Amino acid sequence: LIYDTGGSGVNALRIVSSLPSNPAVTAILGPLTLEEIYSLAGLKSPLPILIPKSASPGLSDLSQNLFFLSPSSKTIAQRTAQMMVRELGFEHIAVLSHGSGKTKLMTDYFLEECHQLGIDPVAVEWYIEKPENLSRQLKNIRRAAWSLVPEKKPGDQIMNLEIDSLDALFDVDVTDFFELPPEDEIMDRKDSAKVFLETIQAMYIPIRPDELTYIGTQLPVYNLKTVLFGNENWLDMDLLNQEVIGPHVQGMRVISDVSSALSASNQDSFSNFHALALDHAGFIQSIIDRGVLKRRQFLEQLRNQPGFHGKSTSILFIGKNKNENGSAQVLEYAKKRLRTLGVYNGESFSHTTE
């Protein structure tokens, strides 16, 4: 059965309210607008409603019959922090983010999870206007990187010398072992930005649409050798692959709701929904193949399914009601291509062979 809601929350509510009387209907699947989702959130229906994309974080806790097949923005942010800390063991993390709207909310979720994991980022920098000039923020992050460079004691090199006992019979000059640099060659933290700093292990930079050109071209100037973690707005492949950006962000990771093939073509929403539909149909079929036909059985199997791995997505329900997808795709950018490293659910990281 196929119904057209016309994008109306009222129509969606009317249609869904009428379906429980049809014994042939076991579940409802469809891409709904936010208005339609909110209209159905308070409806107590015996039919599970499967929604391809996520809505507001926390809605799954309030609506038991809504099943979100994609991880929420909060889950994506949490998985990003968990990947850095739990899987990669990073402790020195810096953050650069826009200070309002959805990006600010995403960054707040990330910072909250970092704190839950016992990590306090070494630098958190915000910007409000169009990021045409981020020199202040990036200089502050670079200063934080300098502050992590271990201090060298003046006598360290001399105290670590090993002198053979036979040499002690003669006059020994330290210049016999090494040449001291001239005074004007000694480097300190006031040096030029040409010095590469590796003390910040990871940087989290979620950008808004149309910000890649600004941030992607400024970041390399500050010579921070780190693992960059971005978001889906970095994946404008035509821009990302340009010489002024791509070579400087090799190894960038993006925690996403879909695989690399789908993320790399994220400008084509029709292709995205078509690929998601194939995966979600396969997910439903995997439950039906267990011999589940009745509504109650289907609902129980839905909440307790052990995990599904499709071509473009993975599904493992978490949360109070076991109705929000907790699996995320881990993507890596390198050599002008995007590949999927694996699937991460916060507890285990399943590597792929892509």
Model features per residue range: what roles?
Residues 1-354:
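Extracytosolic ligand-binding ectodomains
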